[in-house]
Each structure stands twice: as C-alpha cells, then as structure tokens.
C-alpha cells in the first residue's frame, strides 16, 4: 500500500468527513445504551502538521485552517463547533500543529461505556495507531485488513453504533468491492449506522457505485458530496454515503454543507450535493 494520509491530514476531505462523523457521534450518545465504533481503515491516529509530509503538500492550510478562521452563520457555526473544539484540543496554544484521525476524534465523543475497534493493516501506521490509543480502555487497535474486519467484528454485542469505512482507493475495483461489502455488512448488523467515504475522480465509477447501493434493498441511504473545484490538486471532490443515518442528520447537513463548501472552494466547479439514494426523499 502506497497511500500515506500524513500528506493529506486536515485537508478539505478530512474536514468534510470528520465534521459529519462528529455529528453522528453526538446523535449516538443521546441514548444511554452503549455503542460501538468500528473504523475499518483507521490510519495512524494522529498527524503532525509541522512534519515533512504535511509541510510538503500544505493541504491542511486549505482545509482545517480555512475553516477555523472563517466566520459562519450562527446555526452552521453551532453545528461545527464540537468538531472544531475537538481539533483544537490536540494543539496547545493558538497554532494548529497536530490533526487527529478518525479514531482519536471518535474517542473525544465516546463515553465510558462505549467501545472503539480501530483497524489498520499497514505496519508503520498500525504501530502508530497502537501508540496513539494506548492506555484508553475503550479502544482496541487491531492490525487487520479493514475488509476482513467487517466480517470478523460484525455484529458486535452492542445494538447501536457506527461503522466508518474509509479505504485508500488504490485498487481499480475498490468501488465495486465497497458496494458489495457494505451490503453484506448491513445484513449482518442492520441496526448500525454506516459511513462510507469515497474520492470523486471517476464520475462513471461513482455513479455505478451509487446505483448499486440504491438497488441493494437497504432502507435509508443518504449521499453527501463536497467539491472544492478545479485547481485544488489531485483530489477536487469527495463524497459520503450514510446508511441508517440518525434522523436529524440530513437537516443538519442542509444547514452545514453550503457554508462549509463556500469556505473550502478553491476554483470553478465547487459546491455540494445532498440527496437520498433510498428512503426519505
């Protein structure tokens, strides 16, 4: 595997993904029963924004740094505040020097009774993840292929929870594999929330992926996409598919995505899309 997230930590795609992740976690913790978070491609856990990788690309300056500095309308600012406060907690002082990956961000919003299973196969990232999670009894780092993990850890003993699937998309068949795997996973644990991240580079592949999910029989599928426009670099747009989203999440994203896109857009073609593939139209 050649993908290294340290080059991209805190970029627009991370901001988009993690802002939505935090909203989901806040909904899950509204009920007292414990929940499980399964992160199939968890990465290293914590990223140094002053290190050579992040400094080389500077992507975080056009992502999290822009959003932190931007004035937002009160309603959108309120929805984004828990995410921004969590990010700030990893960098003492005013300057942003570290950016948490999904596992550490999730733990900020999990309670004593909740559990995290964070999976990462790549050896150096897996070792870093284990160090990042060490000492937290709620978290388990597992050196396992994320696709294998879905079969191994579903269903968990908890009835409620979130499965985050964020693969590196290095293989040509990643979209078809993702569609097949997520439907199989949902059938094993139909009460869980599923959050799937994907890059938008090949519109035909993305369309086929959305069509396969829409025809899958899963009852509620919400799609959100955010594009920062031409000239933004190798990745100009990303999407999220949300299966069984919390019932108020769609309304929150209607409020949040437009101002977020306006802050993050860097060129022509920027904007967002939010629609139901199945269910609540």
Model-derived features with residue positions:
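Class I S-adenosyl-L-methionine-dependent methyltransferase catalytic core
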Residues: 1-281
């Amino acid at each position: 595997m050649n993908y290294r997230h340290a080059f991209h930590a805190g970029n627009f795609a991370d901001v988009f993904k993690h802002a939505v992740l935090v909203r989901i976690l806040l909904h899950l913790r509204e009920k007292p029963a414990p929940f499980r978070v399964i992160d199939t491609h968890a990465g290293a856990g914590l990223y140094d924004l002053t290190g050579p990788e992040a400094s080389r690309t500077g992507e975080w300056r056009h992502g999290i740094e822009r959003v932190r500095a931007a004035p937002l309308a009160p309603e959108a600012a309120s929805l984004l505040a828990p995410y921004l406060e969590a990010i700030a907690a990893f960098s003492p002082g005013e300057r942003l020097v570290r950016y948490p990956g999904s596992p550490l961000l999730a733990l900020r919003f999990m309670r004593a009774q909740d559990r995290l299973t964070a999976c990462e196969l790549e050896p150096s990232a897996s070792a870093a993840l284990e160090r990042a999670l060490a000492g937290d009894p709620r978290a388990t780092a597992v050196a396992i292929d994320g696709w294998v993990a879905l079969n191994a850890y579903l269903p968990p003993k908890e009835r409620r929870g979130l499965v985050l699937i964020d693969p590196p998309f290095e293989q040509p068949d990643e979209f078809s594999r993702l569609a097949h795997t997520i439907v199989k996973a949902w059938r094993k644990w139909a009460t869980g929330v599923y959050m799937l991240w994907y890059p938008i580079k090949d519109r035909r592949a993305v369309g086929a992926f959305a069509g396969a999910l829409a025809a899958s029989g899963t009852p509620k599928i919400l799609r959100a996409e955010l594009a920062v426009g031409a000239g933004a670099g190798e990745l100009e747009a990303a999407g999220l598919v949300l299966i069984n989203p919390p019932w108020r999440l769609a309304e929150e994203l209607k409020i949040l995505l437009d101002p977020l896109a306006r802050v993050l857009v860097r060129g022509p073609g920027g904007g967002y899309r939010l629609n139901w593939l199945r269910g609540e139209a």
